Every structure is written in structure tokens, then in C-alpha cells.
């Protein structure tokens, strides 16, 4: 199998660049999960795969390049390959997932006593359906990660989680339904435990403009939303809470 990424955009001046080994990992993962999911990973599994990724592109950047947000591009490689091969192997792929890419929320500020605090919170969305089953709920795919537990967030930060719940009807409808996403509500306390103002939030995510697409006539899932006091936030700027 030859995967040719020629024509990919050139590397960018922000952190979305992907190094070759990251690109290869998600290409490998997609193909192996389709054709040999039960074989333990080993070097021989990759021997039938040839990856062509031109140097200097966003999928094979040259030093120096910022790569901290590489998942914003790299996580879509698996989805792209599934879609490309769905014509030939429809029973071995899944539709697009709401947890692609994994959503990272970076909260930071100062506690009441002046001590800095900082926390990275990871969340997933609904997983795409296959031809034989509905998608998993609240899943981080294709990354090997997990949703940050509420107990960790509240013990590590001054924030309060008022709500974490499945988002009804967020999965794409079809013969097989996409998995449900989640709604999570954070509150900055205003009591004796309140941190100093401002509380800053950085969001690294996707799906707020383009919804995860269905396959074989299935409908797309819901788009992501980021609200501050009930009002949509600016997804391209720094918002202080």
C-alpha cells in the first residue's frame, strides 16, 4: 500500500506542523486497524506500507518548525485514510469522530494566595459509527488518551465542574448512529476559594466549524461549541474568564 501525501500544504508558522514519524504512526494505525487489527504491533506490520510525505510540508516539516499542536493536523490522517479506502473496504472503516482531534483546554492563572496554577484538560467526542455498530460515546480517537476525570480537575485547580453529561442527539443520525459527545460546564468560584482574576483559557480543538462527516449516506454529527457565560467565544483569540 502506497500512501502519497504529495500536494499537502507547506509547513506553517504555528504549532500545527507534523513530523514524519507522527504522520507515519497515524497512517500505520489506520491501515493496520483495517486489515490486521488482531496482530500485536511489530516492525513487520509496517513492511507493506510505503509513505510518501514531501519534506517541508505540514505532514513532514523541516527544522525549525513549531509542532506542539501537531495533533490538530495529524489526528485527521486516520480519518482521511478511512474515507479514501471506504470505497474498497466499507466494512472495515468508521465515519468521522467528534474526538478528532482530541480537545485540549489549558486553564491558568493565580490562586488567591498568589501561587500560579495551570492545568491541561483533555476531552473527547462521539466516535464515528461503522457499518455494523453505533459509535462509542465520548471517546478520544484516534489518539491513545482519556477524558480528564472531574476529580482530578477539581483537586488540581480552583475550578468547579458544575456539569458533565452526554449530549443527547449529538451523534450523526443514520442506519448506525455516531457516538454521543459531551457537555461540560466549568465555573470560576466567587467565594473564599476564588482565584485571582483573570482566569485564562486556551483551547486547542476542532469541529467547531466543520462537523464530523458521516459515510455511506449517514448524516454529520454536531459541531463543537465553546461558550463563555453562555455566549460563543472567539475561537481564534485569547479569552479571559
What does each of the following model-derived ranges do?
Residues 1-241:
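Glycine/proline-enriched, intrinsically flexible loops and inter-domain linkers
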Amino acid at each position: 500500500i502506497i500512501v502519497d501525501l504529495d500536494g499537502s500544504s507547506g509547513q506553517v508558522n504555528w504549532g500545527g506542523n507534523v513530523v514524519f514519524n507522527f504522520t507515519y504512526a497515524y497512517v500505520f494505525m489506520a491501515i493496520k486497524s483495517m486489515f490486521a487489527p488482531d496482530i500485536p504491533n511489530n516492525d513487520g506490520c509496517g513492511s507493506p506500507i510505503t509513505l510518501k510525505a514531501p519534506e517541508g510540508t505540514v505532514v513532514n516539516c523541516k527544522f525549525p518548525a513549531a509542532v506542539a499542536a501537531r495533533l490538530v493536523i495529524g489526528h485527521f490522517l486516520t480519518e482521511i485514510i478511512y474515507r479514501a479506502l471506504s470505497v474498497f473496504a466499507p466494512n472495515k472503516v468508521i465515519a468521522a469522530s467528534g474526538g478528532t482531534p482530541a480537545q485540549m483546554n489549558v486553564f491558568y492563572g493565580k490562586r488567591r494566595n498568589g501561587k500560579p496554577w495551570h492545568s491541561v484538560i483533555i476531552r473527547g467526542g462521539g466516535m464515528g459509527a461503522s457499518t455494523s455498530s453505533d459509535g462509542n460515546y465520548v471517546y478520544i480517537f484516534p489518539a491513545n488518551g482519556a477524558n480528564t476525570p472531574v476529580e482530578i480537575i477539581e483537586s488540581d485547580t480552583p475550578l468547579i465542574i458544575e456539569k458533565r453529561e452526554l449530549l443527547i442527539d449529538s451523534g450523526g443520525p443514520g442506519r448506525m448512529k455516531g457516538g454521543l459527545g459531551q457537555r461540560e460546564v466549568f465555573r470560576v468560584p466567587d467565594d473564599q476559594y476564588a482565584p485571582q482574576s483573570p482566569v485564562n483559557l486556551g483551547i486547542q480543538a476542532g469541529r467547531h466549524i466543520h462537523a464530523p462527516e458521516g459515510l455511506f449516506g449517514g448524516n454529520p454529527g454536531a459541531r463543537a461549541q465553546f461558550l463563555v457565560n453562555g455566549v460563543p467565544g472567539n475561537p481564534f483569540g485569547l479569552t479571559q474568564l
